[in-house]
């Protein structure tokens, strides 16, 4: 399996999960501006939408969209929490959490909009605060991770998104439970290794 990624982008979540499952994989960095990979390949021939992540499951077989990729990797692992049974409430809860990660992604993604004016930046910060307040309400003090005692793909995705605030020097640590979740995820060996492999550490 090959992961096409951009350092620090949402593809970092898939990178963390690949490290968690402990099966062989390879990495290929993508320049999303030029749509070229580090080996000089035309990325649009791999993913016509030009976004990361994408995984090449086998030659010519490519999967895109982070939520789908995270679930696919989990389904092909030996980790029970990564692959709740299809049709179960646990699977629906994982999909629900990944769906909310998409909402977080949209809000935080505004931080990277080109030519962001002061007014636009204020609006982005307000959107982030609104989503983070919603996220905070989802997290229970009695749970180790988002969905319970087990680490899941949703934890990795949410933690990566919150890390974008660090990149942009936006303090969101007052969202106490959410920030504690991020810190817990980033302390995992799988996350530390992914940061090193992407040149972020």
PLM regions and their residue ranges:
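Active-site-flanking alpha-helical
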Residues: 74, 161-162, 195
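A generic structural-conservation signal
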Residues: 27, 174, 194-195
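Terminal-tail/helix-coil boundary detector
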Residues: 196-201
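Alpha-helix/helix-capping structural signal
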Residues: 68, 189-190
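GST-like fold's C-terminal all-alpha helical module
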Residues: 89, 96-97, 101-189
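GST-like domain detector, emphasizing the conserved glutathione-binding G-site
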Residues: 1-122
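Short beta-strand(s) of the beta-wing in winged-helix/HTH DNA-binding folds
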Residues: 53-56, 146, 192
């Amino acid at each position: 399996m090959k992961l096409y990624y951009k350092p620090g982008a949402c593809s970092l979540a898939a990178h963390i999960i690949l490290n968690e499952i402990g099966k062989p994989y390879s990495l290929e960095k993508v320049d999303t501006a030029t749509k070229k990979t580090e080996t000089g390949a035309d990325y649009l021939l791999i993913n016509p939408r030009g976004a990361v992540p994408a995984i090449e499951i086998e030659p010519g077989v490519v999967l895109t969209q982070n939520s789908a990729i995270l679930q696919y990797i989990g389904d092909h692992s030996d980790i029970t929490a990564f692959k709740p049974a299809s049709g179960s409430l646990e699977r629906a809860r994982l999909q629900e959490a990944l769906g909310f990660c998409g909402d977080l992604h949209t809000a935080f993604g505004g931080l990277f909009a080109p030519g962001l004016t002061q007014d636009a930046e204020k609006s982005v910060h307000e959107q982030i605060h609104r989503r983070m307040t919603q996220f905070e309400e989802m997290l229970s003090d009695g749970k180790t991770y988002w969905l319970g005692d087990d680490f899941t793909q949703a934890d990795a995705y949410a933690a990566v998104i919150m890390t974008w605030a660090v990149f942009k020097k936006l303090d969101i640590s007052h969202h106490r439970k959410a920030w504690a979740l991020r810190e817990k995820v980033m302390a995992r060996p799988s996350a530390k290794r992914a940061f090193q492999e992407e040149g972020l550490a």
